[in-house]
UniProtKB/Swiss-Prot annotation:
MF term (GO), any: S-ribosylhomocysteine lyase activity
Keywords for this protein: Autoinducer synthesis, Iron, Lyase, Metal-binding, Quorum sensing
Subunit structure: Homodimer.
Species: Shewanella piezotolerans (strain WP3 / JCM 13877)
NCBIfam families, sorted: PRK02260.1-2 (NF002602)
Pfam families tied to this protein: LuxS
GO biological process: quorum sensing
Protein's UniProt keywords contain Transferase: no
Catalytically driven reaction(s): S-(5-deoxy-D-ribos-5-yl)-L-homocysteine = (S)-4,5-dihydroxypentane-2,3-dione + L-homocysteine
Protein name, as recorded: S-ribosylhomocysteine lyase
Cofactor: Fe cation
Principal EC category: lyase
Length: 169
């Protein structure tokens, strides 16, 4: 099985909250697609709550589009990581980490402004596979912790696992 890019970085040295360019590629027509690692929690030390990350998934996707989409950027997808330490965001364009971090902070402020659970988009059995597994309060706790901590940048050149380590795993 091929080694995926996300498993070539040292998770023991990742900072959180932090933005990292996980991958960048060009389409056959020359458009740039960038995948960002939006790391909310320090891997293997913290984890996002099940209900909190699910609610955040519904809110974050729209709020990030509000703050980041524009003439040169269009978000394709924002999805939670299976390890529940963050989200991957795929987009057309190549915004800087600082622009992404600013949009992320603004999106967290938007989460705090949601008053009632009924305001969560697609919160119904037709549009959500586990529509009863949500917590606006837990999503707000996550947002508050991100705002309080601020967002750093994780750089691949500082996190890349050596061939020696990879071959020994």
């Amino acid at each position: 099985m091929p080694l995926l890019d996300s498993f070539t970085v040292d998770h023991t040295r990742m900072n959180a909250p932090a933005v990292r360019v996980a991958k960048s590629m060009s389409t056959p027509k020359g458009d740039t697609i960038t995948v960002f690692d939006l790391r909310f929690c320090v891997p293997n030390k913290q984890i996002l709550s099940e209900r909190g990350i699910h609610t955040l998934e519904h809110l974050f996707a729209g709020f990030m589009r509000d703050h980041l989409n524009g003439d040169n950027v269009e978000i394709i997808d924002i999805s939670p990581m299976g390890c529940r330490t963050g989200f991957y965001m795929s987009l057309i364009g190549a915004p800087s980490e600082s622009i992404v971090a600013d949009a992320w902070l603004a999106a967290m402020q938007d989460v705090l402004a949601v008053v009632e659970q009924s305001e969560i988009p697609e919160l119904n059995e037709y549009q959500c596979g586990t529509y009863e597994m949500h917590s606006l309060e837990q999503a707000k706790e996550i947002a508050r912790s991100i705002i309080s901590a601020g967002i750093n940048v994780n750089r691949n050149d500082e996190l890349t696992l050596s061939d020696e380590i990879l071959n020994g795993l």
